[in-house]
Structure formats: C-alpha cells, structure tokens
Amino acid sequence: MKALWALLLVPLLTGCLAEGELEVTDQLPGQSNQPWEQALNRFWDYLRWVQTLSDQVQEELQSSQVTQELTVLMEDTMTEVKAYKKELEEQLGPVAEETRARLAKEVQAAQARLGADMEDLRNRLGQYRNEVNTMLGQSTEELRSRLSTHLRKMRKRLMRDADDLQKRLAVYKAGAQEGAERGVSAIRERLGPLVEQGRQRTANLGSGAAQPLRDRAQALSDRIRGRLEEVGNQARDRLEEVRDQMEDVRSKMEEQTQQIRLQAEVFQARLKGWFEPLVEDMQRQWANLMEKIQASVATNSIASTTVPLENQ
C-alpha cells in the first residue's frame, strides 16, 4: 500500500508542480536571495526532484520518508526566517518602541501564516495517503482531482504569504537602516559573513536533503544491474545445456541411421541369397525346355520330309 501511495502521489505532484513552476517565479519577482527564501525554494525543489525519479525508485519511496524530508525543509525555512528577523531586530537601533512593536507583530503574523501554509500542505499529503490506504483498490481519480485542486490553491496561498512576508521583512529592514545610519559600515561587515554563511548552509542543506534518496536510487540501480547479470548468466548456461542436449540427439540419430543402413544391407544380401538359386534353377529349366522344344521341332521336320519321298 505504501508503494501505491508513492505511485499516486508522485504523478499528482508532477502535474501540480509543472503547472506552477512559472507561477512561483512570477509571484516572487523581487527575491533578494535571502537564506529563508532559498530554504522555501528548496521545499518546492524537493517535490520537483521526487517526480524525476524512475518508477522503480518511486516504488521504493516510503511516504513516511517524504513527510520527514518535507518536515526538515519546513523547519529549515522557519529557522532561516527567525534568524533573519533576529538579525534585523539587532539592527533597529534607536527606533520608537511603538514602531518596533508594530513591525515585529506584522512580521510575526506573516511568518505564522507561511508556517501554517507549509504545515497544511504536509498534513494534506498525509491525509491523502490515509484516504488512499482505505480505498483498497477502488478508483482514485476523484481523490486525486480534489488533492490536485487543493495543492494548486495551497501553492498560490503559500507564495502569496511568502511575498507578504518578504515585503514585511523589507519594511523591517528599511526601519533598521533608518535607525542605524551611523553604523552602516559595521552592519555591512557583519552582514557579509552572515550572507556567506547562509549561502554555505543552503548548499549543505540542499545536498544533504537529496543525498539519502540518491544513495537509495544508486543502491537500487546496483541491485537491478546485479539481477540482470544473474539472469543473463542463467540464460547462457541454459542455452549451453540445450545445445549439448541437441548435439547428443544428433549423434544418436546419426548412429541409429547408420544401424538402419547396415541392417538394410544385410537384409538385401539375405534376399539375394534366397532368390539367386531359384533364378538360376529357373534359367536352367528354361534352357532345357527350349532345347527339348528345338529338338522336337527338328525331329518333326525330318519326319515330314521322309514321308513324301516314300510315296513317290
């Protein structure tokens, strides 16, 4: 049933994500390449990557693993958002407490909406798996259609809230810049290592999220290759065995043919031995008969000639 869940989920996500790829780019035109934005992109990139695997690897995937990977990516995204927010709070400097509280509240609300969107998406996938498990082989077209519609709505809502959070953080950052004009140089020196660290963390997280699945795909490929080689060796051994059997049959047939030929020659010799004396005896009798007939004819001819002479 887990294999069925993976097979149904992956094609569905393929269609949803393929339709929404351009839409995601259009909804975040002003991306500043912040770590939290990269983490959010990895959340969707992971789903896109799953659908590129072969059917055999998709059958190997367990729904619990997909959920765990999504959970890790969600936590990474929210962690980066909190880290970026904390970084901006440290830069606010002498800003009015009322302004600080208002900005913090707006960012917190946008952050909560984004987290709720990702949590809702993960829960919806789990609910879909449970519904598939209870259908016991029945048609899942209606269920897939409903989930597809829900995922499209969730994608739009997620990108809308991400865009809203991006704008709130931009305002937050603007307030920080206004409140810390005298410390611009120091802030830039601090932001440089943080940005580089975020990029490095992004690269590590990106490769770390996909590496377990790549390892499983490679292991499965090795098993399939080994199985094919084993089947090929068995087929070759069987072919050699059949060839040997055919050679034995051919040898036996040639041997039997030779025996039949010898038996026929012996039988022919026997027949010749039986009939030759009869033929020779018949030839002798025929020759004697012909001699007797010729002698009788000659005697009759002489007798016929003698009688007329006596009458004269």
Curated annotation (Swiss-Prot):
The modification Methionine sulfoxide is found at M135. This is Apolipoprotein E. GO terms for cellular component: chylomicron; extracellular exosome; high-density lipoprotein particle; low-density lipoprotein particle; multivesicular body, internal vesicle; very-low-density lipoprotein particle. Keywords: Chylomicron, Endosome, Extracellular matrix, Glycoprotein, HDL, Heparin-binding, Lipid transport, Lipid-binding, Oxidation, Phosphoprotein, Repeat, Secreted, Signal, Transport, VLDL. Homotetramer. May interact with ABCA1; functionally associated with ABCA1 in the biogenesis of HDLs. May interact with APP/A4 amyloid-beta peptide; the interaction is extremely stable in vitro but its physiological significance is unclear. May interact with MAPT. May interact with MAP2. In the cerebrospinal fluid, interacts with secreted SORL1. Interacts with PMEL; this allows the loading of PMEL luminal fragment on ILVs to induce fibril nucleation. Residues 202-282 are annotated as: Lipid-binding and lipoprotein association. Sequence repeats lie at residues 72-93, 94-115, 116-137, 138-159, 160-181, 182-203, 204-225, 226-247. Residues 150-160 are annotated as: LDL and other lipoprotein receptors binding. Belongs to the apolipoprotein A1/A4/E family. Its main location: secreted. Residues 1-18 form the signal peptide. Residues 150-160 are annotated as: LDL receptor binding. APOE is an apolipoprotein, a protein associating with lipid particles, that mainly functions in lipoprotein-mediated lipid transport between organs via the plasma and interstitial fluids. APOE is a core component of plasma lipoproteins and is involved in their production, conversion and clearance. Apolipoproteins are amphipathic molecules that interact both with lipids of the lipoprotein particle core and the aqueous environment of the plasma. The modification Phosphoserine is found at S139. InterPro entries: ApoA_E, Apolipoprotein_A1/A4/E. It comes from the Eukaryota. It is found in: Secreted; Secreted, Extracellular space; Secreted, Extracellular space, Extracellular matrix; Extracellular vesicle. Gene3D superfamilies: Apolipoprotein. Heparin binds at M154, R155, K156, R157, S221, D222, R223, I224, R225, G226, R227, L228. GO terms for biological process: acylglycerol homeostasis; cholesterol efflux; cholesterol metabolic process; lipoprotein metabolic process; melanosome organization; phospholipid efflux. It comes from Rattus rattus. The gene is Apoe. GO terms for molecular function: cholesterol transfer activity; heparin binding; phosphatidylcholine-sterol O-acyltransferase activator activity; phospholipid binding. Residues 72-247 are annotated as: 8 X 22 AA approximate tandem repeats. Residues 270-282 are annotated as: Specificity for association with VLDL. Residues 258-312 are annotated as: Homooligomerization. APOE exists as multiple glycosylated and sialylated glycoforms within cells and in plasma. The extent of glycosylation and sialylation are tissue and context specific.
